[in-house]
């Protein structure tokens, strides 16, 4: 309209109908349009009011229609939100995560699953062992079946890694593109799936003379507990007729703190035990994974005439 007035196509006294906005306007003597449908004639500054679609201090430009003003006041752009992708790793019929005795042979069977959310398409999904990729695919879920591994005095750590394309840009609530925070192309790594090799505490009793203290003898004791620590308390039940007691744990721990004969409340039984250092094998037995153990043995003069309990504190 302004261009037509300037060109002289339209001048004062004319009445025009605007096709694009469906408004009628009268051209006044000063060649300025007067709209039949109300429009603001001056700019309006928002002053002292908050919570509107436009902020305090902003300006509503002149020439806005009533509909446009209402929209500006009651419609406020809310940016789109984006959810990051994720990837998980789970057991798929192989060795569960957690602790095993050092020397145990495990077969990892794992499943890696990509959760796309607002990222682009998956391009690669991998199973990592430490920093090394041991298997990969292009579709989720990806199943990995590895070779048998002997876990030593260590933690074997697996994880899943997914590489993906850029995600699409969403619109805000007003239908306008809202790119801030959209997901760029990249990769994501799962939390660790750990299998830790740990040593056992061994303990038990027997009939007759105390046998020679060897790795094999220690490993054959009837009871065991994984990963003993300083301060651990455990009970050794001694049945009628038993004549010797043996317990053993890694030599990296302190000397036994206390052995209590529970039935008599005698806390000084540790002095009756003899400590011997023995190299004890890991779960494979034989000479595999030998580690120094403190082996405590106690030989009774006569077989136990009644049930007894030794409460041991490392």
Which stretches of residues belong to each language-model region?
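Short, surface-exposed terminal/edge motifs of secreted or surface/virion proteins that either
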Residues: 12-38
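Short, solvent-exposed loop/linker segments at the N-terminal edge
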Residues: 91-108
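Solvent-exposed loop/turn segments flanking beta-strands in beta-repeat/beta-sandwich domains
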Residues: 115-131
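Surface-exposed beta-strand/loop patches in extracellular or lumenal glycoproteins
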Residues: 232-264, 310
């Amino acid at each position: 309209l302004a261009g037509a007035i300037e060109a002289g196509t339209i001048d004062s006294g004319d009445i025009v109908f605007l096709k694009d906005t469906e408004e009628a306007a009268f051209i006044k003597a000063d060649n300025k349009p007067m709209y039949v449908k109300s429009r603001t004639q001056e700019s309006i500054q928002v002053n002292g009011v908050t919570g509107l679609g436009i902020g305090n201090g902003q300006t509503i430009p002149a020439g806005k229609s009533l509909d446009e003003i209402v929209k500006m006041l009651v419609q406020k752009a809310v940016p789109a939100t984006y959810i990051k992708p994720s990837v998980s790793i789970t057991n798929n019929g192989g060795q569960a995560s957690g602790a095993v005795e050092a020397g145990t042979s495990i077969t990892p069977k794992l499943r890696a699953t990509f959760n796309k959310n607002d990222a682009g398409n998956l391009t690669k999904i991998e199973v990592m062992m430490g920093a090394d990729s041991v298997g990969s695919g292009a579709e989720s879920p990806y199943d990995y079946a590895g070779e048998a591994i002997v876990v030593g005095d260590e933690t074997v750590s697996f994880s899943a890694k997914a590489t993906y394309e850029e995600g699409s840009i969403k619109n805000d609530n007003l239908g306008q593109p809202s790119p801030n925070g959209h997901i760029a192309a990249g990769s994501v790594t799962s939390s660790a799936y750990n299998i830790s090799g740990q040593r056992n505490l061994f303990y038990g009793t027997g009939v007759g003379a105390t046998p020679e203290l060897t790795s094999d003898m220690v490993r054959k004791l009837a009871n065991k507990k994984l990963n003993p620590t300083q301060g651990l308390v455990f009970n050794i039940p001694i049945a009628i007729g038993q004549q010797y007691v043996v317990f053993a744990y890694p030599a990296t721990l302190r000397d036994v703190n206390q052995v209590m004969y529970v039935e008599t409340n005698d806390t000084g039984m540790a002095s009756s035990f003899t400590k011997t250092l023995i190299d004890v094998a890991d779960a494979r037995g034989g000479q595999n994974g030998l580690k120094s153990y403190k082996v405590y043995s106690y030989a009774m003069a006569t077989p136990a005439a009644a049930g007894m309990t030794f409460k041991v504190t490392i």
